[in-house]
């Protein structure tokens, strides 16, 4: 099966190294919750707690700090997808996706508003997690290869209790991961959460070896490669080639061949597979990791070159950042990031774009800018949206 570069429909820029929607909880007042999104949970948590610039105004109050992340939803293939999910999670009373979920009861008029009128702070962990469960079961988001990572045993217990009374189960595309860490405030500094989220790799370091292997393999064997699925010879100049992500496996495929194989193995009628077994090494491979390396190889440009050379680009706070109380955070080591990866939006970005996807729209659609006749892609890193209608 042949797929020419001119017919490419993979991406026009590298898939983000990491992007998640998160649920914050106040360590001082556990009933206070906040929903947001970010490509860097550790940095974003510093912002919310006043140790770095850019935190949301709704989380500035010292009576609520420190904030801790108790759950994140990860695996989004683009920033736009994460923003669509964040908006729907924040606006469950208006999003069209909840209505498609069986018969679970949801108060869409929200008789129980946030703690303070207009504060944007939620007050019920079970309700917020219940809303999340319904979104993940919706026709639209239920087809995405997302993972819900719980960092709090208490939050996971609320989740489990919701599941016991919910009408339906999560689709097979959705995974749940337990990653319990110390909760509440740090015993060393009450202004810091016990879990600072630095254990999560939000960089491209995870694909460096895969990218190096693919670049070498495709560069050295331009006339001797054949697709592991259809057995036809591959052209590195005219075809989109996918390489197995496992270290010792050198299997290569037409992107359409391996996609179709994975879909058949899944018994799926969808367009995009979730994961599958490499026909050569017989190990499990996720579609997202294949596409992340492919998109970096095809569209990374100088950033892909940096990654291959192992060059590290330090973040702005490498030398340490002062806290709102005059303290200083330890310096961080460099990360594998891309130029332009951390362009923050204004706090009212949601007022300028429409991120609610229609039932016909896929993640390929960019957000529609108000007052514009064309479509532009949202290029952002952190959600600065504070309010919930």
Swiss-Prot record:
Recorded GO MF terms: 5'-flap endonuclease activity; crossover junction DNA endonuclease activity; zinc ion binding
Any one GO CC term of the record: Slx1-Slx4 complex
Zinc finger (SLX1-type): 227-281
Superkingdom, taxonomy of origin: Eukaryota
Acidic residues bias locations: 338-349, 379-389
CC cofactor: a divalent metal cation
EC number: 3.1.-.-
Residue ranges constituting the GIY-YIG domain according to the UniProt record: 17-99
Main location: nucleus
Oxidoreductase recorded as keyword: no
Keyword set, alphabetical order: DNA damage, DNA recombination, DNA repair, Endonuclease, Hydrolase, Metal-binding, Nuclease, Nucleus, Zinc, Zinc-finger
Region entry Disordered, spans: 303-389
Catalytic class of the enzyme: hydrolase
Any GO BP: double-strand break repair via homologous recombination
Localisation per UniProt entry: Nucleus
Family: Belongs to the SLX1 family.
Function, as annotated: Catalytic subunit of the slx1-slx4 structure-specific endonuclease that resolves DNA secondary structures generated during DNA repair and recombination. Has endonuclease activity towards branched DNA substrates, introducing single-strand cuts in duplex DNA close to junctions with ss-DNA.
Subunit and interaction comment: Forms a heterodimer with slx4.
PANTHER family per UniProt: STRUCTURE-SPECIFIC ENDONUCLEASE SUBUNIT SLX1
HAMAP family: Endonuc_su_Slx1 (MF_03100)
Name of the protein described by the UniProt record: Structure-specific endonuclease subunit slx1
Source species of the chain: Talaromyces stipitatus (strain ATCC 10500 / CBS 375.48 / QM 6759 / NRRL 1006)
